[in-house]
């Protein structure tokens, strides 16, 4: 009996040795963008659905705003306060040195959307299961702040049980991978017209 308990304890210890939690300490920030709610005559829309604050997240805000932003905030701070509803963008990059599975945990804002490499994700109870390849991932969090509410920056962590080295940063630099070699748009051929006035360039795009 004691032997079984010792073996089980040793296994649990080994599992904990490989478990890693990466806390996102800094996020690139853009906003807040004040959003005025619609003038509501009826509480229901044409589909008999009641308007909710979450609908304000549908407001289109280009992600390039946060990519070009020079404002970096500590995740432990706030981004001020707005008299009206506002939408903000917070972003960071996840880098993994190998294939690994993990969980991205997000807390803070009540209403938010998560995009990874421009693709919208669907978290469940603030958690998102991810399978990372050895490359860089861009994570953008679009979140809503209610009127006169403190704009709390999202708290984000990534948990994995593997030996992978995963880092979170606001630096857009990335590794040069095989996808950079094979994927993308490249010049295939170039030819000059007989009179020398025109240049015909053929491009090839691979995915």
Where are these regions (language model features)?
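Solvent-exposed beta-strand/loop surfaces of large extracellular or lumenal domains
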Residues: 69-78, 111-130
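Accessory carbohydrate-binding/adhesion or oligomerization-edge regions at the termini
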Residues: 20-76, 138-178
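Aromatic-lined ligand-binding clefts that engage carbohydrates, nucleic acids, or primary amines
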Residues: 96, 100-113, 139
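Bacterial Sec-dependent N-terminal signal peptides
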Residues: 1-22
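A flexible loop/linker signature enriched in serine peptidases of the S9 family
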Residues: 184, 203-207
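Short beta-strands within extracellular/lumenal beta-sheet-rich domains
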Residues: 84-94
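Blade-terminus and WD-like Trp-Asp/Gly-His loop motifs, strongest in beta-propeller folds
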Residues: 133, 190-198
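Short strand-edge motifs at loop-to-beta-strand transitions and within beta-strands
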Residues: 90-92, 126-130, 137
